[in-house]
């Protein structure tokens, strides 16, 4: 089953005949594989690890699948397809990345849902591309076309990051946020509540949904001997976390994971501001899976602490998995949940 934007690409796939194609920021479908009906080869770069895992089993000698914020090579393509990101500040980065991999006068296709911000494309497209032209309007989605008319600046990741100083009892921490990462340029209220009530941890600790590494850096500033692992599903978040740790001279294992699937073994501590804030059924299911899985991966005497929107129905799930738990702090928006394994 193809998403609506992918269906619009298929409607216009004749423009890709015998092209070497790169698909950036693809969705959780098999559009890159479907394009092999017309394209000579397709490479796909996912910025969402779940999307990568969905496509990766289809890889072959004509379809190569990657996860990350950049490709591991400098290959050039006749066409680059960009899925317009839900986080609009990420769009200029994706256009710059597309330009790095296009042949001169190569074709840029940008697709996205009508309500997803793509209508602002004309203002966002850099001047090394020709003015965007609307090619199709269907399936509640828009498709724009352009071409590479000038040389784009090289991508330096730090140029796409903002920084701010976070004050902690142990001293200031530098937080690095890449474009499109949650709570860019400031500390969100949920994390602020969590940081003001950090537990004392030891041993192997997991930061689930690490984002830009705010929790990780604060933990390591206060408790530098921790063996910390930071996981996220978002490539830009993982890269931000690595930048934050490097900026503060800290070390942690940073890697992608779909839920807890790519972690192994048990942890002495699990701490998180989990990225489950929209209340959608699908998101709630992911949150419930995280709670259940994390309960299984907590060592004896291990500590589990998360912050969550107080209006979301997580209390019952948490109580069902952990039984007796404590609420160390709450405000009108967020609630802190704490549990220590027996």
Curated annotation (Swiss-Prot):
GO CC terms in record: cytoplasm
Keywords: Cytoplasm, Methyltransferase, rRNA processing, S-adenosyl-L-methionine, Transferase
Listed GO biological process terms: rRNA base methylation
GO molecular function, one term: 16S rRNA (guanine(1207)-N(2))-methyltransferase activity
Enzyme class, spelled out: transferase
EC numbers, comma separated: 2.1.1.172
Coiled coil: none
Gene3D superfamilies xrefs: Vaccinia Virus protein VP39
Reactions performed catalytically: guanosine(1207) in 16S rRNA + S-adenosyl-L-methionine = N(2)-methylguanosine(1207) in 16S rRNA + S-adenosyl-L-homocysteine + H(+)
Intracellular or extracellular location(s): Cytoplasm
Principal subcellular localisation of the protein: cytoplasm
Disulphide bond pairs: none
Keyword NADP listed: no
Subunit organization: Monomer.
PANTHER family noted in UniProt: RIBOSOMAL RNA SMALL SUBUNIT METHYLTRANSFERASE C
Function, in words: Specifically methylates the guanine in position 1207 of 16S rRNA in the 30S particle.
Family affiliation: Belongs to the methyltransferase superfamily. RsmC family.
Name assigned to this protein: Ribosomal RNA small subunit methyltransferase C
Organism: Shewanella oneidensis (strain ATCC 700550 / JCM 31522 / CIP 106686 / LMG 19005 / NCIMB 14063 / MR-1)
